A protein has these predicted regions:
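Short amphipathic alpha helix immediately N-terminal
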Residues: 138-157
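Arg/Lys-rich amphipathic alpha helix in sigma70-family domain 2
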Residues: 65-83, 90-98, 185
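Hydrophobic positions on the alpha-helical face of helix-turn-helix-like DNA-binding modules
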Residues: 39, 63, 132, 148, ...
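Amphipathic alpha-helical segment used for protein-protein interaction
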Residues: 2, 101-144, 198-202, 206, ...
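Sigma70-family region 2
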Residues: 40-56, 70-79, 138, 186-190
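Structural recognition of an alpha-helix C-terminal capping motif at a helix-to-coil junction
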Residues: 34-41, 54-66
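Solvent-exposed, charged amphipathic helical/linker segments at domain boundaries
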Residues: 158-164, 169-255, 259-261
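A short, charge-rich alpha-helical start-of-domain segment used by transcription regulators
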Residues: 1-20, 30-36
Length: 316
């Protein structure tokens, strides 16, 4: 009989990084949580046969990766609006909601960052979590995705990946080359990435929050990069250009100061805000922010996400 306390002691420390791994694979926080639960259940059932020939961490990653690969056989690719069509040039048209599409979800940093305050550990946890990376990886076939994440993000040796996937080292290297070739053909949003705690970035974020809270469209226009992008899943349309984005916001958002409140949080290793309208949860804004302005806004219009960020549904 396996001792449940012993099992918990040996596996609990890996839960957060396994959640990050499963999320990178499937692009959904909800599905990643389910897959971590499945991983732990499978590990519990097989724990009595674990001989320690591989480390506990490697063993759990093998179980988690195989669980993800099995799940991806029966699921559709997670996407952002920019992965479906070109940008819209009409920000004043009524939005087209597409709740049937499996949208990419944001990962709250609080769910995956290590409980220790070690800066190096926190930076390592953020690696490979950028929303743009997660979105583009979803274009890869599942096994290419797994190899790329294990090799390029987690820095596993080719021999370790080969053992996990039960293939040859040659097959791993070939799969990684095909993944890189596929990614080179895909557009990847890039910016001068800065840490969210950079003082210049913090100042940009303060101005962003103030612009919404004060309904200051002029300030927002100045803050957004000229070619900034805004996406709003589950709305299919997305917009490029600061002037179009501000027209969109002026058309669809409250226009009186004090009607919007912004609460700082973080997602995918990026700065984010809980966006409240008249005190009620509305959306999560995940930002690509640079010291000189906002490059991209992904506004997830789903108040159900707030709980995962430890944010209240209401500020009233």
């Amino acid at each position: 009989m396996v001792d449940i306390d012993e099992f918990a002691v040996h596996t609990a420390q890996y839960r957060r990084e396994l959640l990050a791994h499963c999320y990178r694979m499937v692009g959904s926080v909800d599905d990643a949580e389910d897959l971590v639960q499945e991983t732990m259940l499978r590990a519990w059932r097989a724990y009595g046969d674990f001989e320690g020939r591989a480390s506990m961490r490697t063993w759990l990653y093998r179980i988690a990766t195989n669980a993800c690969l099995n799940a991806l056989q029966h699921s559709s690719r997670r996407v952002l609006p920019s992965g479906l069509s070109g940008p819209s040039d009409d920000p004043e048209t009524a939005p087209f909601l597409s709740n049937e599409i499996p949208w990419l979800q944001p990962m709250p940093d609080v769910r995956i960052e290590p409980e220790s305050s070690d800066p190096a550990a926190i930076v390592a946890a953020r690696e490979g979590m950028r929303l743009a990376l997660i979105a583009v990886w979803q274009y890869l076939p599942p096994r290419q995705r797994a190899v790329l994440i294990l090799r390029d993000v987690l820095r596993w040796k080719a021999s370790e990946v080969a053992e996990l996937l039960e293939v040859s080292v040659t097959a791993v290297n070939s799969t990684l080359q095909r993944a890189h070739a596929t990614l080179r053909q895909l557009p990847l949003a890039t910016a001068d990435i800065a840490e969210p705690d950079d003082p210049a970035v913090r100042a940009v974020l303060d101005r962003y929050a103030a612009a919404f809270e004060n309904a200051d469209m002029a300030a927002l226009t100045e803050l957004l990069k000229t070619d900034a992008v805004m996406e709003m899943p589950p709305i299919r349309e997305w917009f490029r250009g600061n002037l179009r984005i501000v027209r969109l916001i002026a058309t669809r958002c409250p226009t009186r100061a004090g009607e919007v409140q912004m609460v700082r949080t973080a997602a995918n290793g990026q700065p984010a805000f809980g966006f409240y309208v008249r005190g009620e949860a509305h959306s999560i804004h995940v930002l690509t922010a640079t010291p000189t302005g906002i490059e991209r806004i992904v506004s997830f219009h789903d108040s159900g996400l707030f709980e995962g960020f430890d944010l209240p549904k209401s500020l009233l």
